[in-house]
């Protein structure tokens, strides 16, 4: 790929349309100050081809649009694969403004569009035409020369890291990362499946399913047996039910026995009810005496507590009053502290002013000026104007240099115009002369042709005979001269060719003169306006300089020194000191407020304690009530000959007493009734035998049989469901085992690939292979561009150079001079470019310099090497700041920046 023509507009610093013709450039320098737009020209090429740049990538491309412009456009004409293409890319601040076109130049001179499909399709088509993707293109065509110098002098590990970065070996790391992620995923999948098999399907097997089936069949057999047993028990129960009437006597006898066994308990209950009736009148006296005692004890405790609380409240009030007096003693200090805080506020403001002004507390000056805000702003504005003036003068000098170069080229073109005008006159005169010679030769040829035609009839003339043409008698046969028509015809052809060459030369010269004259006329006006603008800018700069008096920067330092002195007088940290004063004021006021609040609380507690304390006479009333209740209780207990505890134990509620008495009466009546009924049944049944125990046993057996049958049927259903679930789990288990086996195979595959792609194995092997190929290519290239003096090789892990002009001496690259280092790094750069390009032929290289100022000998070596590169058919562009190097190159592209935007001027020679 070789660039032929670049047109850009609205692209970063290039606001206006800029045309750059690379067609006849072989070796050139791209020169300009920092920020002028040199890199933007390279970015424009990558943007045109790929829609992205090395600095921005594929995002944030609106930053490429010149400020104030709505769109940018870049058109790059280039040659690839023996054909000429043109890619045009437009980008706007709106999505609708974005467009890309690809055209191919046909042999008939017409452009054929190749822009069908989406923008993605067009981008892929462009990449196919160029033969390189974006990353490879930037590494192959735009070589970072400085990194190759670091590659030469780096340690082996550093060289491999840098080489991996230059060759894009990071993709191997991405592959390894992807493989590691796959290992992690398949390992997790395999472990999860194995865990499921071990936990949820541990007991799932064909044997377990067969065992459940056998258990279900046995349970079905048991259920059938229990069904037969239940029918037999039902028959027995029916026979026993026929004699159910005989059980009435046994039931009556049983009930009588139960009632007789309860007789002692009923008697004791009746006795307890009788005692409770005796003590019923004493129980209220017991309760009254207890309540009087409790009230007397509580009154005694409350009086003691109130007295203690009153003493405590009095002591607390005294302490609170003393604390308030102590806090109020600090209150007179507040005005003094507030005055100090106000003074520190002004010092804090001075510190803030000093910080905003860009000064420091340590600033000093031998002759400080008293601080004045207006004077400082005036001095700062003057200093800014002075800095702006310095920048403007620097830009103006650059503009003058660019104009000078442009005028030199203009003068050269003007001289060329004069020389070619004179040449045109000479070509015209030569053409007219050749035309006259052609006319003479053509006339001679015509005459010779006529002569030859007549001579062809001479053989038919005989003396005394009539002429075959005029029929007159021939008296004498004339003699004819032999003429070589072929020679004359050859002379005419040569003269015709000469006239045609003169005519074509004349037409070409006249077209060139016309085109150059148009350019001269246009540039004459343009350079005149340029010169006038420079003069006006010079006048403006002088006018601005005239209004700036003294030394504004020194005035700024003097004012800041005065302000810094004021800040230092206030202490190292006036803001902290002021905060300390304010905090102390707040602390004094807070202590006073807290003491007042504490005194108020203590006085409230004292008033409450005084109100709580009751007269001691109330304690005497409670004591009299207690003694009276105790005397009444003693008399009542003495009449019953009981103690208070015995009376309380014998006491029952009225409802319980009534219940016990009623229970005794009912028991006596029921026993009498049962005895009469039993005697009557004995008379009715006589001696007939009846066994109720057998009937109960049959009934129990039948109930148990029903329960067992139901349980057996439920168990059979559960076993059938369990068998079905086991069969389903067996199917799922087989599927999971298949998945686990597949996950294991995938894990083994990705684990092997991951181990192979690790940095310490595969990538180092790849880098070693790349390094070996690079050194081979770079060594051959270094041999060519150094006129057969140097070769580059690897010795014990270090780069060395073999000096063939010095008996093959081997030297470490660290001992090379600046020029020699440049040759070696240049060889590495171009070797890497060829390696990355593969089988794609690169017709252009752009190198950044990667070196500083060169001595004359090194400069000569570099210039010779670059000249050798040009002879290899490459277009080589050097992005450099070294003026001495750029002047040695055949052509220079001078990039300059002005208010109207950047522009490029080509200087040849």
Curated annotation (Swiss-Prot):
Alphabetized UniProt keyword annotations: ATP-binding, Coiled coil, DNA recombination, DNA replication, Endonuclease, Exonuclease, Hydrolase, Nuclease, Nucleotide-binding
Gene3D superfamilies referenced in this protein's UniProt entry, alphabetically: P-loop containing nucleotide triphosphate hydrolases
GO molecular function, one term: DNA exonuclease activity
Keyword ATP-binding: yes
GO biological process: DNA recombination; DNA repair; DNA replication; double-strand break repair
Coiled coil (residue ranges): 204-250, 285-453, 484-549, 576-614, 652-751
A Pfam cross-reference name: SbcC_Walker_B
Gene Ontology CC terms: DNA repair complex
Domain of life: Bacteria
Physiological role: SbcCD cleaves DNA hairpin structures. These structures can inhibit DNA replication and are intermediates in certain DNA recombination reactions. The complex acts as a 3'->5' double strand exonuclease that can open hairpins. It also has a 5' single-strand endonuclease activity.
Record-stated family: Belongs to the SMC family. SbcC subfamily.
Description of how the protein assembles with itself and partners: Heterodimer of SbcC and SbcD.
Protein name per the record: Nuclease SbcCD subunit C
Organism whose genome encodes this protein: Deinococcus radiodurans (strain ATCC 13939 / DSM 20539 / JCM 16871 / CCUG 27074 / LMG 4051 / NBRC 15346 / NCIMB 9279 / VKM B-1422 / R1)
Gene: sbcC
